[in-house]
Amino acid sequence: PGHKDFAEDTFRTLTAVDSVIVVIDVAKGVEEQTEKLVEVCRMRNIPMIVFINKLDREGKDAFDLMDEVEQKLKLRVTPLSFPIGMGYDFKGIYNIWEKNINLFEGDSRKNIEETIAFNDINNPELEKIIGEKPANKLREELELIEEVYPTFSIDEYLTGELQPVFFGSALNNFGVRELLDCFIEIAPTPRAKESDTRLVKPEEEKLSGFVFKIHANMDPKHRDRLAFVKIVSGTFEKNKPYLHVRQGKNMKFSSPNAFFAERKEIV
């Protein structure tokens, strides 16, 4: 996120991730904090995907936003999905990656789960589905994309030379499936991690990991501290002794937690 309130926590988390999704507000565009965070990603060679959010609201033109991302964040982008309209006129997303259309039901603001395949964007059925004017505009936009933006390459994405762009509305869970389906397909597998003595590879059997942040007093009933650990290799098991390298002693963890947003559960 681009807001400065997220800054400190996000900087710490970037030491533990293998890939990143950069979220851009369609109305605000690139925010100051986004520029700083993207620079950290660039320094750490972390592959990035851009998600332009809140398409159900009025905002900047899609092409203007991609230009802004390229100029302010110094990224080389190519869209893998593209919006059909915006705000009140938002009709859905054309998935360039899979060549289909996902319609947005404007009145109820609900995602229509069924997608419509369009291998040929010149198919006259398109007018019946989204209307003549939006269909012609979409064809012109896709033609412009093909002429102006580079063809997507997974290798260039993984090396940080090219960043794919997706559009949608996270609040309405719209356009997110396209993003995540592609993410699963192209995102890198866990990378090796340099320790003080050697390079630790993820396929090694012995467990190794590192603490990337510590939170205190997360439970108001207790003066607790939680250490967040990135697993680098092996499999973690509770109640099994593990060596704390800095202290040089074994430690057991009887109630390790896994977090998903605000929800936590014992592993």
Per-range role (PLM):
Residues 1-267:
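Structural and coupling elements of P-loop NTPases
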